[in-house]
Amino acid sequence: MSYFGTDGIRGKFGQMPITPEFALKLGFAAGKVLKRTSPKNKPLVVLGKDTRLSGYILESALQAGLNAAGVYVHLLGPLPTPAIAHLTRALHAHAGIVISASHNPYFDNGIKFFSSEGKKLPDSLQEEINKELEKDLFIEDTANLGKSVRVTDANGRYIEFCKSTFPYHFDLNNLKIVVDCAHGAAYSVGPSVFRELGAKVVALYNEPDGLNINENCGSTHPESLQKAVVEHGADLGIAFDGDADRVVMVDKFGNLIDGDHILYILATQAKNKPAGVVGTVMSNMALEVALEKANVGFVRAKVGDRYVLQALEENGWVTGGEPSGHILTLDKSTTGDAIIAALQVLTVMVEQNKALHELVNGFKLYPQVLVNVRLEQMLDPYSIPALVAEFNKAEEQLKGRGRILIRKSGTEPVIRVMVEGDNEQEVKTLAEHLANAVRSQAQVA
């Protein structure tokens, strides 16, 4: 059995596999694999988390398992997922581990690994960990145990790294920025980065209590940020998700700037334009058309930052991302980093001396509707003939004018129904029709 999904191991806390007992076994299994593959007698792992209350329990269990396997652990505390990736490299660790369920509600949690290079752990090592989980847990001789220490300057190290990706001769002195931290991992470091670069920062949702992460805030709920930017007379707004690997922005008029807009800015407005951009099957057709006009290459990957990264490496490109706000700039960071992505947009604003809304003038997304159909149990929509017939009928209706995309979430029991086309009302009607078809078939199944 494989416990690893598209983004590590994820689920509801207290239910397998997100339990303290499993986390202990996982830490031990991962520790045994790392000891076999490490040139060091006692390899080092860095361990961080977001602000979920359950993260503290999982952290204790994981570090106990790792220590029992003879691995040293550096505890980083609550920090963005990309910070863990960076510090894995900066501290010369053999691996990094993040406890987070990203944009999911507080009752979910997850565990994912980074390699020593700060990238997602190779599938081969995940498979080795899976095999090790089938074995009995046994304790090393006391002299061979590892131990855990807390890294007290982890926040400062990451803040300085983020600032290093912003041109040293630029500053943000003339900008007022509203930052929505989603009560998540960037609640402290996020506002600090922009303040230290000179911006006047209004911080929102930066008081995590362990249960309020992503609750009606952050990149998945930007409505209050849009309102706050206008109320504060700010130049722009920035919203992270719970682990700060996603970012969306808001211009001074309260208009949403999503991942497609950000990719458009980085690909067409920056001084150093990339050779190509990787989007996903969810990327708006308007982005593809705009990049073609700008003579910038464009390819689509499957949904998920690991697939975007894979396509970037295959093409030798550095810029890619998703409409949800996962933005990769591989010349700056090894993984999607919300703070660094926002800094790259701010760099373009400063170098062009333009407001955020001016950078997207003339770029208009095709009407697109995404309906998330939450189910009691996951099903494969393409295994049901009646649904396939509905999908085919919709594709024929939009032929040459739009597209549909029906896919299963890799992290939760959700079917995502996306419809895109040149007629907004038609798109809305068709998306709801297909979502209702999925719901009705799920009840039958």
UniProtKB/Swiss-Prot annotation:
Pfam families: PGM_PMM_I, PGM_PMM_II, PGM_PMM_III, PGM_PMM_IV. GO terms for biological process: carbohydrate metabolic process; peptidoglycan biosynthetic process; UDP-N-acetylglucosamine biosynthetic process. Its EC number is 5.4.2.10. Its cofactor is Mg(2+). PROSITE patterns: PGM_PMM (PS00710). GO terms for cellular component: cytosol. Mg(2+) binds at S102, D241, D243, D245. SUPFAM superfamilies: Phosphoglucomutase, C-terminal domain, Phosphoglucomutase, first 3 domains. The modification Phosphoserine is found at S102. The active site is at S102. Binds 1 Mg(2+) ion per subunit. It catalyses: alpha-D-glucosamine 1-phosphate = D-glucosamine 6-phosphate. GO terms for molecular function: magnesium ion binding; phosphoglucosamine mutase activity; phosphomannomutase activity. Activated by phosphorylation. InterPro entries: A-D-PHexomutase_a/b/a-I, A-D-PHexomutase_a/b/a-I/II/III, A-D-PHexomutase_a/b/a-II, A-D-PHexomutase_a/b/a-III, A-D-PHexomutase_C, A-D-PHexomutase_C_sf, A-D-PHexomutase_CS, Alpha-D-phosphohexomutase_SF. It is an enzyme of class 5 (isomerase). The keyword Transmembrane does not apply. Keywords: Isomerase, Magnesium, Metal-binding, Phosphoprotein. PANTHER family: PHOSPHOGLUCOMUTASE (ALPHA-D-GLUCOSE-1,6-BISPHOSPHATE-DEPENDENT), PHOSPHOHEXOSE MUTASE. Catalyzes the conversion of glucosamine-6-phosphate to glucosamine-1-phosphate. Belongs to the phosphohexose mutase family. This is Phosphoglucosamine mutase. The lineage of its organism: Bacteria, Pseudomonadati, Pseudomonadota, Gammaproteobacteria, Moraxellales.
